[in-house]
Amino acid sequence: MAVLTHGSPTPSGAYFDGKGINFTLFSAHAEQVTLCLFDEQGQERQIAMPARTGDIWHGYLPGGKPGQRYGYRVSGPFDPSRGHRFNPHKLLIDPRARALEGKVGDDPRFTGGVSQPDVRDSAAALPKCLVIHEEYDWQGDKPPAIPWGNTVVYEAHVRGLTQLHPDIPPELRGTYAALAHPALIEHLKTLGITTLELLPVQFHIDEPRLQKMGLSNYWGYNVLAPFAVDPDYASGREGISPLRELRDAVKALHNAGIEVILDVVFNHSAELDVFGPTLCQRGIDNASYYWLTPDGEYDNITGCGNALRLSHPYVTQWVIDCLNYWRDSCHVDGFRFDLGTVLGRTPAFDQHAPLFAALAADERLSACKLIAEPWDIGLGGYQLGNFPTGFSEWNDQYRDAMRGFWLRGEVPRGTFAQHFAASSRLFEQRGRLPSASINQITAHDGFTLLDLLCFNQKHNQMNGEENRDGSDNNHSNNFGCEGLVADAAIWQRRKACQRALLTTLLLSQGTPMLLAGDEQGHSQQGNNNAYCQNNILTWLDWGSADRALMTFTADLIRLRQQIPALTQDQWWQSGDSNVQWLDSQGQALSDAAWEQGCQQQLQILLSQRWLVLINATDHECEMHLPEGEWEGIPPFGVSDHAERLTTWRGSAHTICVLIKRD
């Protein structure tokens, strides 16, 4: 019969030392913690944790080996008004579990009880934690260490990017292994992508509401076990674990000079609101892990039912340990933080919040690329520009300004220029670098680039919420016809804007982020909230990809890397050689000219050699070029754009780049 010795309060989690397993669990308010061991048949053995050091409960299992299945039961007060929801009838996941076996279904046994504890035992329905100890030969792997000034981010979903790729073997499509396939890596290299940002690959579950409708949480933001690799994206090949497969992918991408950033979710947990399932933190120490109101209710500043209390000392350390685990075990190069304002809540947002301080103090993590989504839905939740040094931030003001300028004619060129210059008013005055602005026209959340030009209204009926979900503020323009079916004249205008927006994104100062599929002309049929669509709506259709647009995008990225004003990651100053702002006559824009309403024509001279010509009007225009001899460069040809070396005639919604002859 298994017996636990006292063991040690460190290391955290379930750790195999070669002779046995040391188990630890944090709970400040528990009265008893019970370790539950399971055999292959699911038979359970319960053993009380024999020791407590501070708020860490611990025990050591002599002879325990990797592959051991386990969970916890935690006893204590059930007093919701004080934030306590202990219930020993509920088996609980270790918040530090590095692997899980099984799935979470829509099972009533997970209900923990709203006003009184639910006595149905949940062990048979809950996935079991697995102790793992996997050695791996990285074969000298080193991080690509791409400078921020050269970084081009490509946001992608493991399955969506690879599920329909014809050159990847069918058994590998939609998996981590597909990311390592030469065909996928060749696409990224041909495009010029430096940094692949993956939507969550942490172990996530599908909300009960989606399961009832036959849908799933495709994006993966409903995370249950943040230390564990999600097995849903593993190929299941014999002898190759999900962790190894992800490691293989990172190693292959690194060998190709491509960084890997993980989108991580620490703002909320998969336990949802008070009516949600009791699976982990709620039953372990609800009052420590979650932000609660004075009467014990969940403070739902995320819109997901709960919010993790990341300013609590232990919860702060839990996040730091998790990030270091991913960095050390998978060699990832950085992290994008979903609803990042929660990271700094104390409960008000604070640049000096404990988690920010811990990140800055950690030499390994502070050297990573850290990207924040700088908002949540709580009071004071919008914090664009306010994150501490070391973070870059998703810039929705850039997105809306560029959409409004090109598609709606409602943004003046002064506003356009300010955001083209890495939103300098937001970041420069706060001591941040241009790379702090993660520029985007589109992201996973919202319309794709093509849909932005084909739909004025969202079409989210497939999501099962009667089209209520998703944003109604899209700044889109269908050019007179809703949908993908339109006449040639409308498509001509759409394609012109498609190229104009891509050019603007990839030639703006700051860090560009390209949504996977935008370079191919991918459409989601007007669905701007496809979080639950694990199907051909979200999977890239490589067979019908716009090859000309892919070439255009690759040429733009190559062009970007040639322009010092865009790669040196230094602020442009008035009168320096980085930028000159010119009017349609090739003359420097005066202060008065900047203020002239919604002028939609502009010339931008970068590094004294590359001239960006912009006509965002709905009619043709002629521009006089500044002094010098100019010629077109890929993807812009002289024959297409320049009538002669002194003028340029631009069609409606057109952008062009010329280079000055030596």
From Swiss-Prot:
Gene3D superfamilies in the record: Glycosidases (3.20.20.80), Golgi alpha-mannosidase II (2.60.40.1180), Immunoglobulins (2.60.40.10)
Reactions that this protein is recorded to catalyse: Hydrolysis of (1->6)-alpha-D-glucosidic linkages to branches with degrees of polymerization of three or four glucose residues in limit dextrin
InterPro entries recorded: GlgX_C, GlgX_Isoamylase_N_E_set, Glyco_hydro_13_cat_dom, Glyco_hydro_13_N, Glyco_hydro_b, Glycogen_debranch_bac, Glycogen_debranch_GlgX, Glycoside_hydrolase_SF
Catalytic residue positions: 338, 373
Top EC category: hydrolase
Keywords from the named record: Carbohydrate metabolism, Glycogen metabolism, Glycosidase, Hydrolase
Residues that span the membrane, as ranges: none
PANTHER family the UniProt entry points to: GLYCOGEN DEBRANCHING ENZYME
Name assigned to this protein: Glycogen debranching enzyme
Provenance organism: Yersinia pseudotuberculosis serotype IB (strain PB1/+)
Origin organism lineage: Bacteria, Pseudomonadati, Pseudomonadota, Gammaproteobacteria, Enterobacterales
Gene giving rise to this polypeptide: glgX
